[in-house]
């Protein structure tokens, strides 16, 4: 039997994990951009291609060339991180539960991590 308090506490803990993981990734991204100008330039271009993709998609234009360029930039960024000895996924968000990305839900389904936390009454862990 689930207690409402335990469920709320489990959701709060999972939310804190998500917020913390995202904040840590933001810090790593900022550090990388300030230490490695080539990565900062790629990030700047990625922001531009992302906006351009959105505009083209809304206008019904051909997004394939920009989509390819975006993928090239992401691959180049990951290669640079490897080259710098950081690991390609260094700036990625490191979620406690990669299945739900620390939301407690996969789509509209309650994730295993939230179920387990509530079921065993370990929301305080």
Placement of each model-derived feature along the sequence:
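Non-transmembrane amphipathic alpha-helical segments
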Residues: 35-56, 73-76, 80
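Short, charge/polar-rich alpha-helical segments
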Residues: 1-11, 17-44
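Amphipathic alpha-helical coiled-coil segments
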Residues: 70-90
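Conserved small/polar residues in nucleotide/adenosyl-binding loops
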Residues: 123-125
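Short, flexible, mixed-charge glycine/proline-rich loop motifs
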Residues: 84-94, 102-105
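The −1 position to Zn-ligating cysteines in a subset of zinc-ribbon hairpins
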Residues: 96-99, 110
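Short, charged, amphipathic alpha-helical segments
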Residues: 62-72
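Cys/His-coordinated zinc-binding microdomains
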Residues: 101-104, 112-117
């Amino acid at each position: 039997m689930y207690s409402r308090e335990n469920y709320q506490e489990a959701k709060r803990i999972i939310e804190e994990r998500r917020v913390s993981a995202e904040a840590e990734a933001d810090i790593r991204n900022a550090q990388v951009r300030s230490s490695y100008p080539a990565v900062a330039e790629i990030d700047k271009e990625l922001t531009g291609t992302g906006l351009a993709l959105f505009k083209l998609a809304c206008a019904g234009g051909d997004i394939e060339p920009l989509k390819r360029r975006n993928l090239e930039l992401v691959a180049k960024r990951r290669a640079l991180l490897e080259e710098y000895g950081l690991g390609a996924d260094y700036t990625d968000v490191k979620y406690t539960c990669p299945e739900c990305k620390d939301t407690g839900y996969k789509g509209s389904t309650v994730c295993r991590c939230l179920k387990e936390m509530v079921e065993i009454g370990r929301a305080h862990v």
